[in-house]
């Protein structure tokens, strides 16, 4: 059935139901359409609530929906919507007073989701602060701008952009989400682009390490423009194809959120899964070569394994392998669901923080460059203080003035 025809039938049913309600409850006659002012027509919102014909300036209340998204709501509470002075309905409907009726299991899950959301906010905030600090360090310390650190810098940039757009998505309220606004779809598209670029820069990190360690190929022959193309340009056609698919096949809910059976999201999730699998192969080869070199050394076996484990743990967030630990929901039982919720929230929100710590704050080149800057600043400050004191103290016969030193030097 045509969507416009279906909507017309629903609105007609809405009008009939409201007319019956008015007659039964004795609400009186609806506003006179021939009156001096325009009025708001009977309409049906995106959630399915019927709003009756109302006078301009009226704040209309309707019972909360009985069911929405499979959740039962308390119908004794009301939703509110304003009929504007120009005879049109306000775009925003106030459903804030509608409360779900939850059983014990749903209440438990609701509590866990709330805690997970707090972990997400905390992790993203901590990550953004650490990432911005790391970004500024790479920006200021020009002496360390080799290809490896430029790759780290770009990866950190994608984390910053991804986290900022994540915060923007959290600001979208339910009405805008259900209304499928254009700007809302644009924010979702930009967010998904930064998600894909983030994973592709993890892939670039893996390519660089695999080339340098496993293939023993000189990194001097690697070209920066090629990595920039992989990290920033290849995700563009992927996201464009996804946006076209969403526009024609799943144009709803701001293009955010995935229902079972929706395949359009795999247009960008497929390449992400592919680069994660390739990075997993890179990690396996890197650790294998590392173990081979450690066995050839004279260190004890315990120290060898400790170094290998340490290197593996450091590489996990850089290559995005942590996402593979809980990429798929493990099951329907309570324990699996709770573990899935908390691990996903922690790993995804704090990954930017771990990347900043391991590859900037613990980076030997960064720390050495910072120490040199600090020593130069101390030396410069130490030289300026005695000179300022010498120029401010009056000279005496027993004290050699700064002016006399200059004259002696001139002679």
From Swiss-Prot:
What is the protein's major site of localization? membrane
The family database entries (InterPro entries) matched by this protein are listed as: GPCR_2 (IPR050332), GPCR_2-like_7TM (IPR017981), GPCR_2_CRF2_rcpt (IPR003053), GPCR_2_CRF_rcpt (IPR003051), GPCR_2_extracell_dom_sf (IPR036445), GPCR_2_extracellular_dom (IPR001879), GPCR_2_secretin-like (IPR000832), GPCR_2_secretin-like_CS (IPR017983)
Q: Pfam families annotated for this entry? A: 7tm_2 (PF00002), HRM (PF02793)
Return the PROSITE patterns for the record: G_PROTEIN_RECEP_F2_1 (PS00649), G_PROTEIN_RECEP_F2_2 (PS00650), G_PROTEIN_RECEP_F2_3 (PS50227), G_PROTEIN_RECEP_F2_4 (PS50261)
What start and end residues bound the annotated signal peptide? 1-19
Q: Which residues face the membrane's Cytoplasmic side?
A: 140-146, 215-221, 292-302, 365-411
Compartments it resides in: Cell membrane
Q: Name one GO molecular function term.
A: G protein-coupled receptor activity
The UniProt entry lists membrane topology as:
Multi-pass membrane protein
Q: Which cysteines are joined by disulfide bonds?
A: 14-50, 40-83, 64-98, 184-254
Q: Give the record's GO CC terms.
A: axon; axon terminus; cell body fiber; dendrite; neuronal cell body; perikaryon; plasma membrane; varicosity
The domain comment in this protein's record states:
The transmembrane domain is composed of seven transmembrane helices that are arranged in V-shape. Transmembrane helix 7 assumes a sharply kinked structure.
Assembly notes: Monomer. Interacts (via N-terminal extracellular domain) with CRF, UCN, UCN2 and UCN3.
Tell me, in a sentence or two, what this protein's role is. Answer: G-protein coupled receptor for CRH (corticotropin-releasing factor), UCN (urocortin), UCN2 and UCN3. Has high affinity for UCN. Ligand binding causes a conformation change that triggers signaling via guanine nucleotide-binding proteins (G proteins) and down-stream effectors, such as adenylate cyclase. Promotes the activation of adenylate cyclase, leading to increased intracellular cAMP levels.
Tell me which PANTHER family the record gives.
Answer: CORTICOTROPIN-RELEASING FACTOR RECEPTOR 2 (PTHR45620:SF19), PDF RECEPTOR-LIKE PROTEIN-RELATED (PTHR45620)
Q: Which family does it belong to?
A: Belongs to the G-protein coupled receptor 2 family.
Q: What is the name of this protein?
A: Corticotropin-releasing factor receptor 2
Q: Which organism is it from?
A: Rattus norvegicus (Rat)
Q: Report the gene name.
A: Crhr2
């Amino acid at each position: 059935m045509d969507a416009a025809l279906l909507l017309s039938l629903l609105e007609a049913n809405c009008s009939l139901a409201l007319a019956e309600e008015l007659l039964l409850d004795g609400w009186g006659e609806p506003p006179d359409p021939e009156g001096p002012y325009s009025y708001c027509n009977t309409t049906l919102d995106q959630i399915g609530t019927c709003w009756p014909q109302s006078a301009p300036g009226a704040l209309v209340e309707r019972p909360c929906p009985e069911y929405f998204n499979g959740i039962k709501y308390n119908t004794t509470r009301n939703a509110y919507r304003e009929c504007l002075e120009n005879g049109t309905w306000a775009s925003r409907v106030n459903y804030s007073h509608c409360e779900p009726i939850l059983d014990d299991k749903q209440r438990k899950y609701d509590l866990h989701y709330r805690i997970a959301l707090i972990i997400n906010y905390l992790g993203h905030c901590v990550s953004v602060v650490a990432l911005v600090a790391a970004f500024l360090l790479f920006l200021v310390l020009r002496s360390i701008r080799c290809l490896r650190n430029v790759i780290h810098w770009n990866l950190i940039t994608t984390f910053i952009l991804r986290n900022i757009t994540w915060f923007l998505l959290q600001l979208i309220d339910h009405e805008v989400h259900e209304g499928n606004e254009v700007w809302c779809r644009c924010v979702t598209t930009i967010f998904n682009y930064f998600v894909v670029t983030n994973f592709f820069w993890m892939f670039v990190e893996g390519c660089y390490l695999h080339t340098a360690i496993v293939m023993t190929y000189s990194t001097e022959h690697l070209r920066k423009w090629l990595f920039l193309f992989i990290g920033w340009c290849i995700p563009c056609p992927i996201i464009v194809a996804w946006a076209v698919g969403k526009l024609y096949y799943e144009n709803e809910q701001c293009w955010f959120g995935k229902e079972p059976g929706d395949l359009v999201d795999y247009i960008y999730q497929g390449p992400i899964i592919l680069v994660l699998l390739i990075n997993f192969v890179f990690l396996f080869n890197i650790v294998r070569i590392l173990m081979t070199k450690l066995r050839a050394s004279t260190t004890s076996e315990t120290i060898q394994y400790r170094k290998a484990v340490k290197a593996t743990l450091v590489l996990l967030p850089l290559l995005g392998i942590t996402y593979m630990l809980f990429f798929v929901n493990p099951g329907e039982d309570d324990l699996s669901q709770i573990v899935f919720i908390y691990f996903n929230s922690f790993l995804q929100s704090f990954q930017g923080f771990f990347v900043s710590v391991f590859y900037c704050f613990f980076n030997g080149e960064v720390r050495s460059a910072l120490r040199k800057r600090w020593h130069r600043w101390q030396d410069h400050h130490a030289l300026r203080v005695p000179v300022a004191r010498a120029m401010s103290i009056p000279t005496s016969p027993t004290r050699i003035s700064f002016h006399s030193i200059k004259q002696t030097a001139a002679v």
